C-alpha cells in the first residue's frame, strides 16, 4: 500500500484537541484517480495539472472562500484538464458516449448534491453544487439533471467537444481486448477529487468522474454516491475516494474511513484499515484522500499509482508513485 503524508515521520504532530483550542490551518488535498502506472510521457502533464488544482483550491481558501468553494474550484480545474477522467477528457462508454458523475458535500450541515449519467455538461461538479443549494434533493440523474442544468442557466456543451483523441483510442483498445474491468486491476479507473478545511473549521469534499471506459450505458459508479465516493462531516473529517467503483460502493469506502476516525484512529490508520478491508473482502483496489477536523491529512492508495497534491501552511506537496513526493513553497503574495 502506498501512502503520502505531510511529514517524513508519518503524520502531523497536531494533537486531537477540541476545535476551540486549536489554530485551524487552511488545507486542500486533491487526487487525480487511482489507476495503473501513468506513462512517462504523461507524468509531467499530470503532475502539473494536479499541482495547479491544489493551488487553486488553497488560493480560494486564502481569499476567504469556504471549504465548499475550494473543493469545487479544485475539481473544476481537473475537469477542464484533458489529462484527467472527468469533464473534458472523460472516458467513453460502450456506445462511444460520455456519461459523467459528480458529488459534493458540506461538512457543516451534511448538505450534499450529486448528479449522474450527465452528457453535455462541461463541469458536473458545478451542477452537483447547484443540486445541493437550489433543490430539496441530494441526487439528480440523466435527463432530469440536464433539464435542471438548463433551468439554472448552465450552457450545454456538445458531447463531441468533451471527447479527446486519447479517449477514443482508449475505447478502441478496450473493445479489442474485450476485457471487463476486474476489481484488482483498476486500469480504467479515473476519478478526480478534493477535500478541504477552511478558516472556520468547515470541511468539504467533491468528486467527479467519467466512469470506466467501455462501461455499459447507464452504469453509475461510486463517485456520485454520498458515503462511497466521498463524505464530509465537521466532527470527523472529509474524504474523496477513487478506484474500482463497484467495490467502493459495496464497502461504502469514504464513510468507512471516517468510521475509523470516529473510533479514534489517525488519518493514516483509518485510510489503511478502510482500503485493506476493501482489498481483503473484494480484491478491490483504489485510493483516498482524507483530512480530519484538526487538519491532519493523508493520501493513500493500493492501486499502482494515484496522482495527488496537498497544500497546507503555504507548502505544496505532490506526487504520483510511491516515494515520489516533491515539495515547494507557494508564493506569499
Swiss-Prot record:
Residues bound to substrate: 219-222, 242-245
Description of post-translational modifications: Cleaved into an alpha and beta chain by autocatalysis; this activates the enzyme. The N-terminal residue of the beta subunit is responsible for the nucleophile hydrolase activity.
Keyword check for Hydrolase: yes
An annotated Gene Ontology molecular function: asparaginase activity
GO cellular component, one term: cytoplasm
Tissue expression remark: Present in testis, brain, liver, kidney, heart and skeletal muscle. In brain, specifically present in the astrocytic lineage. Present in sperm (at protein level).
GO BP terms in the entry: asparagine catabolic process via L-aspartate; proteolysis
Entry-linked SUPFAM superfamilies: N-terminal nucleophile aminohydrolases (Ntn hydrolases) (SSF56235)
Residue ranges of coiled coil: none
Known EC number: 3.4.19.5, 3.5.1.1
Keywords: Autocatalytic cleavage, Cytoplasm, Hydrolase, Protease
Further details from the record: In vasectomized rats, autoantibodies against Asrgl1 are present.
Family assignment from sequence similarity: Belongs to the Ntn-hydrolase family.
Job of this protein: Has both L-asparaginase and beta-aspartyl peptidase activity. Is highly active with L-Asp beta-methyl ester. Besides, has catalytic activity toward beta-aspartyl dipeptides and their methyl esters, including beta-L-Asp-L-Phe, beta-L-Asp-L-Phe methyl ester (aspartame), beta-L-Asp-L-Ala, beta-L-Asp-L-Leu and beta-L-Asp-L-Lys. Does not have aspartylglucosaminidase activity and is inactive toward GlcNAc-L-Asn. Likewise, has no activity toward glutamine. May be involved in the production of L-aspartate, which can act as an excitatory neurotransmitter in some brain regions.
Name of the protein in its database record: Isoaspartyl peptidase/L-asparaginase
Organism lineage: Eukaryota, Metazoa, Chordata, Craniata, Vertebrata
